[in-house]
């Protein structure tokens, strides 16, 4: 009898060990890269196994994937059309209303509350950055090769898109023997034309959510863009004198930064402040574990005040350690940060509308959609977005 008791005890032990191993095998899948702070999270949660995944889908196909897939528990996303569409359409899960979550939401500036908080609930957390000068945020400023620019005798930088596009066209027509390209401008989907479209929206969208694309400045910019597109050489290997949206805070070094061009003389163009966030898939099968992951990311932030970009003195910008800036760099950062805007609730830069509008612009650049028809369709879509915003 004793023998059977030992066998039973051994079997029970093995069964319990098996159950423990099953409990430890809960897999949490993050659509995004590994993070530096996950080592501590994994040590604190041995019952969880973190899997990281990536997707090659883009545009509308990517948005559809995130709206329908149950394979991911947490999304790693830039604040932009995809994130805002998921938030507005209810495909993200709010974090629980704990005192800690409310305190964190209250600590955010308005620009960040606009994208992370909805109806009083916290829906996302900035992704901690190990090295960034401004944690979680990168400024969409432009860089230029000042020495080469002066070497080519180019004078003042173009202050408007019209000046820039005219110079781009002239360069392609007359400077093919130069060792430099004028600008790094990808005209495909998501490239330079999309950046110019987004800049127009950021600059001209009104407070009540309306915008008009049938303006002389937009017509001229699109006409020049199409002219340039007809001579654009995508495989040009020469060094570019201007790199749009290439000067991020993490790459400061000795770069000389310039603000993006405006659409009209005398204007100051807004600078996009790009924010990466974690958000929980509303279809997750592990909501508690996913929330634990996002809350751990919040704890990994150096301090919430580092998210305050537009009012922070440059000398205080740091990431775990004090960053020493030269006086010239500090003044430049301060000037740029005053222009910075986080892409928030623009109806024109969200979801289906944005990707359809971008596709229309590509059709125009490829000669399959006349300019008048492009502007008509853009205004039609803008009106649809405004109507949805009122509902």
Place the predicted regions along the sequence by residue.
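Conserved N-terminal structural module of periplasmic/extracytoplasmic solute-binding proteins
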Residues: 1-10, 17-84, 89, 372-391
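Short helices/loops that flank or line small-molecule/ion binding pockets
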Residues: 59-71, 75, 89, 166-170, ...
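Hinge/lid segment of periplasmic solute-binding proteins
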Residues: 81-139, 259-260
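Extracytoplasmic/periplasmic substrate-binding proteins
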Residues: 84, 196, 219-289
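Short, solvent-exposed loop/beta-turn-alpha elements that line the ligand-binding surface or hinge
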Residues: 96-108, 181, 187, 202-221, ...
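Bilobed periplasmic-binding protein/Venus flytrap-like ligand-binding cleft at the lobe interface
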Residues: 143, 275-314
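Glycine-centered hinge/linker elements that transmit conformational signals in sensory
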Residues: 168, 192-194, 204-234
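Long, aromatic- and glycine/proline-rich binding clefts that accommodate carbohydrate-like moieties
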Residues: 306-363, 388-391
């Amino acid at each position: 009898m004793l023998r059977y008791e030992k066998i039973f005890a051994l079997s029970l032990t093995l069964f319990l060990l098996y159950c423990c191993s099953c409990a430890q095998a809960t897999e949490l899948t993050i659509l995004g890269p590994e993070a530096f702070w996950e080592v501590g999270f994994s040590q604190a949660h041995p019952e969880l196994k973190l899997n990281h995944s990536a997707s090659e889908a883009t545009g509308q196909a990517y948005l559809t994937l995130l709206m329908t897939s149950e394979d991911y528990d947490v999304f790693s996303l830039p604040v932009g059309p995809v994130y805002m569409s998921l938030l507005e359409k209810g495909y993200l899960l709010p974090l629980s209303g704990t005192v800690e979550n409310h305190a964190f939401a209250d600590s955010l500036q308005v620009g960040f509350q606009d994208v992370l908080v909805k109806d009083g609930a916290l829906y996302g957390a900035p992704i901690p950055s190990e090295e960034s000068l401004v944690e979680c945020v990168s400024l969409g400023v432009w860089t230029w090769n000042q020495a080469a620019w002066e070497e080519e005798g180019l004078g003042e930088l173009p202050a408007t898109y019209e000046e820039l596009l005219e110079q781009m066209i002239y360069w392609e027509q007359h400077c093919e023997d130069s060792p430099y390209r004028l600008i790094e401008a990808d005209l495909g989907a998501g490239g330079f034309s999309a950046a110019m479209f987004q800049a127009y929206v950021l600059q001209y969208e009104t407070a009540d959510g309306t915008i008009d694309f049938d303006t002389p400045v937009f017509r001229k910019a699109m006409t020049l863009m199409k002219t340039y597109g007809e001579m654009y050489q995508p495989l040009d290997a020469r060094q570019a004198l201007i790199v749009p949206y290439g000067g991020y805070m993490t790459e400061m070094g000795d770069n000389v930064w310039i603000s993006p061009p405006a659409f009209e003389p005398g204007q100051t163009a807004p600078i996009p402040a790009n924010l990466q966030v974690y958000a929980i898939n509303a279809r997750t099968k592990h909501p508690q574990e996913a929330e634990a992951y996002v809350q751990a990311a919040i704890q990994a932030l150096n301090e919430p005040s580092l998210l305050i970009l537009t009012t922070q003195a440059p000398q205080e910008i740091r990431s775990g350690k004090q960053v020493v800036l030269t006086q010239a760099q500090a003044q430049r950062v301060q000037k740029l940060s005053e222009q910075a805007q986080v892409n928030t609730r623009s109806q024109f830069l969200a979801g289906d509308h944005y990707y359809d509008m971008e596709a229309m612009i590509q059709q125009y650049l490829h000669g399959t959609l006349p300019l008048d028809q492009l502007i008509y369709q853009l205004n039609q879509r803008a009106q649809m977005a405004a109507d949805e915003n009122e509902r």
